[in-house]
Regions:
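Beta-propeller blade termini and top-face loops
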Residues: 1-217
Length: 217
């Protein structure tokens, strides 16, 4: 199990994403998404069968049928079933709403606690071989959506001047503060630009708050 989430609007509705959310050389592979509507007594498989690994789930605070799945995808090679997927019908159908390329996965996702249309996602380029792990760089970056995933803005990269890294990033963690949705944290490993960043204006600008390499995601 890589992710589990309980619907804020109905605690009997539980979603589970299978497969480990951390790409290790012995990580377990899953077979997609499961859902319970009776507090875990019974479960139904609800798709994303080729996702392999699901790292995080976000459920809309008011509508238990709206769910975002942060999918790592296949560890040992490229695949199309990775990125951010969304359902608006409780898992009957899924739509891929954030996709970069076959080697770039979703490593983490977080939402404004008062408005799940506002999302932050970490997209992570990685691939494992038996003798090597390619982790980070490539198209690894932080993204934001303000319309429920219909469109996304890339917040980090060499063309951005907002306080987030402009050089290569590794696996990304993101978190919106429950107490204040304007406060957002990004955790990643870089060679020279820090490890933990904070925004106090909903992602417009960022500052480094920790450079300790021991806290990488």
């Amino acid at each position: 199990i890589g992710a589990i989430a309980v619907a804020p609007s109905d605690p009997n509705v539980v979603y589970v994403g299978t497969g480990e959310g951390n790409p290790r050389n012995n990580a377990s592979v899953g077979d997609g998404m499961y859902k319970s509507i009776d507090g875990g007594e019974h479960w139904t498989h609800i798709g994303l069968t080729k996702s392999d690994k699901i790292a995080r789930l976000i459920i809309d605070g008011r509508n238990a049928d709206v769910v975002y799945a942060c999918v790592l995808g296949r560890e040992w090679g490229p695949n199309e079933d990775r990125g951010v997927f969304k359902t608006t019908d409780g898992g009957a159908t899924w739509k891929k709403v954030l996709y970069v390329d076959p080697n770039t996965a979703c490593s983490d996702i977080s939402a404004d606690p008062d408005n799940s249309n506002i999302l932050y996602a970490g997209m992570y380029t990685y691939r494992r071989w038996a003798w090597h792990l390619e982790s980070g760089a490539g198209n690894t970056a932080v993204y934001k959506s303000v319309n429920g995933g219909a469109s996304w803005e890339r917040l980090s990269g060499p063309d951005k001047v907002n306080g987030l890294p402009r050089t290569a990033m590794d696996r990304i963690g993101v978190a919106v503060a429950p107490s204040d949705p304007n406060i957002v944290y990004v955790l990643s490993e870089t060679k020279t630009e820090g490890e933990l960043w904070r925004s106090d204006d909903a992602g417009k600008s960022w500052r480094t708050v920790n450079r300790d390499p021991n806290i990488n995601f």
